[in-house]
Amino acid sequence: MLLPVLRASSRIVMRHSVVFNCIRLQSNKPERSQQINELKLREIIEGTNFGTEATKKRKLEEERKKLEKEREAERQREEKKEREAKLEEANKQNEADFSSTKTGKLKGEDSEVDHKKDEGLRIENKIIATTDSSVDATDIPNIAEEVNETIQKEIGGLPSEKQKKQSALTKKITQYLDSAHDTILTVTRALNDVTGYSAIERLKKSIEEQEEDLKNAKKYVKECKLTYGDAIQKRSHSQREVNELLTRKHNWSPEDLERFTELYRNDHENDVWEKECEKKLEEAELKVDAVQLKLTQLILTRYHEEQIWSDKIRRSSTWGTWVLMGLNVLLFVFATFLVEPWKRKKLVLGFEDKVKTVLVGIAQENDAVLNPIIEKLDQEQKDGSTGHNLEKSGYLTLEDEGGQTTSLPASLDSTSSQPPSAPVLSKEQQGSRILRAKASIKFFILQAQYAIVSSWHRVRVTCVKSYTALTTPSIEFLKLDKVEFGLYTFIISILSCGLGSLATIYCR
């Protein structure tokens, strides 16, 4: 009977000491429930059937994580030291003493680097890497030229080689084309500035940029929608899992407690993340709407500005057409009423001068031929043997209706080798012939002037007759020939085009 009592008392003492030791060991760190600030979560955890096992497991997990963090930090420090050592070694390898040779190339030795590695180093890299004052600055251009020649020989067909091979004429033509191209661009730009099309070009570029912004904004909206959907799905999944854990609250395992604590803590983060995603989505949608509105406004502005520009160009072209028509009319009037009469007058005067010159020449020839004959006849008349001498000379005297005599050849012998002589004319006959020629010339001039005056009179009479025929009520039918019909059609077409253009300009 005493033995069981002693055993029971010893068990009570042992249990009391174990509990006291546990309390003393756990008093150094706060309980898990003290680390949690949320009252609701603390109440849920305190209502479970967990003891000190979960707390110990949590402590072991935290210690393990701390050890892993320390190892990771140590490993990073070692990697950093290795990288620094490699950098120092590379810097030592790059430090070398270079000197120039007769050809201008560089060579150098490094006490810590193998000669084979130094030979593989390119000349241009040596020029950049060296800091030794032994390299002369005057050698660097020669080295650069040699390097450039080496590159051109290795590659070949470079534009610089082709440019060197061009002739002087080709270079001049190229320069002229470049200058002409620049001039054309300058003129085009100036014309666009004058007409206001440069601003429309800038507006078109802004529309293209706005379209690109709209595309990017829509893409960002899609990404925000996907992110927002993922956030909603993640939170709903977390809440579903929390609800499942709460249904079996009194049968939790240590893993369930850790999972519930993690889910409960992440729920607030998920909520914040979901709200942020929703806010970003709303902002992205508002931005899309703003960009879309701005793009629509830019397109409308461009359409309106292009309409104004096209109206301005159309108006300018209309006025240009009218100016050209006016110039053509002025040229037609000038040519018809000034140039053509002057040309006719000049032609008539020239023809008259030519006729006078010809007649004077003929008269001089006749005088040269007839003067010896007249002198001979006068001498024979004085001697009283005019008829006998005329018969001997082969001439006959004829008397016309006016009582004037004319000497003509009596006979023409076809076998005679002598040409027939010209008829003998008196001075009065020669003067009468000259007067007749002048009268014929004056008649021709008067006839030409009459033709001009009569043509203008005929046109005027035709216009008056046409107006009278159109205004007379008794006349019901008109008969036109082809010339009159073509003339009337031309006049009506010009009048209709002019009136239509004036109505179009002043009725806008």
From Swiss-Prot:
InterPro entries attached to this UniProt entry: MDM33_fungi
Could you tell me which species this protein originates from? Lodderomyces elongisporus (strain ATCC 11503 / CBS 2605 / JCM 1781 / NBRC 1676 / NRRL YB-4239) (Yeast)
| TM stretches of this protein | 319-339, 485-505
- PANTHER family linked: SENSITIVE TO HIGH EXPRESSION PROTEIN 9, MITOCHONDRIAL (PTHR31961:SF3)
Q: Where in the cell is it found?
A: Mitochondrion inner membrane
**Chain positions covered by the region annotation Disordered:** 54-118, 400-429
Quaternary context:
Homooligomer.
Point to the regions of Basic and acidic residues compositional bias: 59-95, 106-118
Keywords in UniProt for this one?
Answer: Coiled coil, Membrane, Mitochondrion, Mitochondrion inner membrane, Transit peptide, Transmembrane, Transmembrane helix
Mind telling me which GO cellular component terms the entry cites?
mitochondrial inner membrane
Query: Gene name on record?
Result: SHE9
List the protein's name.
Sensitive to high expression protein 9 homolog, mitochondrial
Coiled-coil residues? 49-98, 196-228, 266-301
Biological processes annotated in GO: inner mitochondrial membrane organization
List all Polar residues biased stretches. Answer: 403-419
A Pfam family (short name) is She9_MDM33
Question: Which sequence ranges are listed under topological domain Mitochondrial matrix?
Answer: 506-508
Family the entry assigns: Belongs to the SHE9 family.
Q: What does this protein do, in the record's words?
A: Required for the maintenance of the structure of the mitochondrial inner membrane. Involved in mitochondrial morphology. Causes growth arrest when highly overexpressed.
Q: Look up and give the membrane topology term.
A: Multi-pass membrane protein
